[in-house]
UniProtKB/Swiss-Prot annotation:
Keywords linked to the UniProt accession: Cell inner membrane, Cell membrane, Electron transport, Heme, Iron, Membrane, Metal-binding, Respiratory chain, Transmembrane, Transmembrane helix, Transport
GO terms for cellular component: plasma membrane
Predominant localisation class: membrane
UniProt topology in membrane: Multi-pass membrane protein
Source organism of the structure: Chlorobaculum thiosulfatiphilum
Binding site for heme b b562: 161, 261
Transmembrane segments: 110-130, 162-182, 193-213, 260-280, 312-331, 369-389, 401-421
Source superkingdom: Bacteria
Annotated protein name in UniProt: Cytochrome bc complex cytochrome b subunit
UniProt biased composition (Low complexity): 1-15, 21-52
Gene Ontology terms: biological process: respiratory electron transport chain
InterPro entries from the UniProt entry: Cyt_b/b6_C, Cyt_b/b6_C_sf, Cyt_b/b6_N, Cytb/b6-like_sf, Di-haem_cyt_TM
Length: 428
């Protein structure tokens, strides 16, 4: 059927489309391309403006917020500190999630904190005593008399310092043996044991160097006897001369003991203590072997604030005991040291050296002192390396041989300490 639309004649140009009338509707937009149809080519990106010749333009860097905790809800004071010390927030959060196991032997954990508490008391009272003490042969004893009689509450300050030193060492011994018998030194806590034992040795060094500072008769002759012992060992005479500042105990010895007591030893203790506490926080507190498998763990205390609050209660009890001992059982000043006078009866070191002192007395035969020093050295090295030797404990197995070894060491210390106490009590 023929169409009615006329075709253009051959040779004639096609008719141009008529322009749309004003107000007429615009032609409809082209429909979206069907799926699979070829997409039109993307327009090329506009070229970046060239930087001035010879000038490097640093590209922008997306930096994280330096303080992600600044918008957290805290009171004004806490928020102020949090905004300035925000790097400590992860540490605080870690301590909040740290837990300590609860069981029948958990109370032994608190003796380490008591030792730290008495060490802080030592620092505070020592700094106050340092304001009046004069470390010279002529003025040392007189300065103690001045502190005792003229300084307001000076007598109490001196007694607190003396008693806190003894209580600190006692707490450290208890902490060490409780750690040993619970096998808390086992893997991965070997370095906690090593650093703790080094802290005990440094604390004994505090006791030895501080004993001479009052410059009284007992302290003078006890130091003379104590510094004689290393002479029998190879190189011991040279070491003793350095410690004494000369061939005999004198004013130079007092000065050197003072510098060791207030400068060198505190610095070493702070370094080792920081390492020890860091390891304790990282590795945590271990329960005795087999307690977890036997269901003897009663639960867990949050280190902060639960365990720390219980620690604080122990500190308050320890402080009350310290004040009671300082007031009711004061340490005597004694008589000023006279190097030319004969040694009085009853010369002995402090109680924490009595076991070694008794062994030296028992080994009075030729070469006995050297043998005693060798035994002390070997015993100390073995005690230090127990975590690395006791492989059964590292495998969470009981090690009765090391338990017996610890009982023998404890018995040696207690029996010989009592022997010295009994002997010298009869001389009074």
């Amino acid at each position: 059927m023929a169409e009615n639309t006329p075709k253009p004649a051959a040779g004639t140009a096609p008719a141009k489309p008529k322009p749309a009338a004003p107000g007429a509707a615009k032609p409809a937009a082209p429909k979206a391309a069907r799926p699979g149809a070829a997409k039109p080519a993307a327009k090329p990106a506009a070229p970046r403006a060239a930087a001035p010749s010879g000038v490097y333009k640093k590209p922008p860097v997306d930096r994280p917020d330096p303080n992600p905790f600044k918008d957290s809800k805290r009171d004004a004071v806490a928020g102020w500190f949090q905004e300035r010390f925000y790097v400590l927030n992860p540490i605080i959060d870690y301590l909040k999630h740290k837990e300590v196991p609860k069981h029948a032997l958990s109370f032994w954990y608190y003796f380490g904190g008591l030792g730290l508490f008495f060490f802080v008391i030592q620092i505070l009272t020592g700094l106050l005593l340092l304001q009046y003490y004069k470390p010279t042969e002529t003025d040392a004893f007189a300065s103690f008399l001045f502190i005792q009689g003229e300084v307001p509450f000076g007598w109490l300050l001196r007694q607190i310092h003396a008693w806190s030193a003894n209580l600190m060492i006692m707490m450290l011994f208890i902490h060490m043996f409780s750690t040993f018998f619970m096998k808390s030194y086992r893997k991965p806590r070997e370095l906690m044991w090593v650093s703790g034992f080094v802290l005990l040795l440094l604390s004994l060094g505090f006791g030895f160097t501080g004993y001479l500072l009052p410059w009284n008769e007992l302290a003078f002759f006890a130091t003379q006897v104590g510094t004689e012992v290393p002479k029998v060992a190879p190189g011991g005479a040279f070491l003793v001369e350095i410690l004494r500042g000369g061939p005999e105990v004198g004013g130079e010895t007092l000065t050197r003991m003072f510098s060791l007591h207030v400068v060198l030893l505190p610095g070493l203790v702070m370094l080792v203590l920081a390492a020890h506490l860091t390891l304790v926080q990282i590795l945590g507190t271990s329960a005795p072997i087999g307690y977890k498998e036997a269901g003897l763990i009663k639960g867990y205390d949050k280190f902060f604030p639960t365990f720390l609050a219980k620690d604080g209660i122990g500190w308050l009890i320890g402080f009350a005991l310290l004040i009671y001992l300082a007031v009711m059982f004061p340490w005597e000043i004694g008589v000023k040291a006279n190097p030319l006078s004969p040694a009085p009866l009853g010369i002995k070191p402090e109680w924490y050296f009595w076991a070694q002192f008794q062994l030296l007395k028992d080994f009075k035969f030729e070469g006995g002192e050297l043998l005693a020093i060798i035994l002390f050295t070997i015993g100390g090295v073995v005690w230090l390396l127990v975590p690395f030797i006791d492989r059964q404990a590292s495998e969470e197995k009981k090690s009765p041989i090391f338990t017996i070894f610890g009982i023998l060491v404890l018995a040696f210390l207690l029996i010989n300490t009592y022997r010295v106490y009994a002997e010298y009590s009869m001389l009074k």
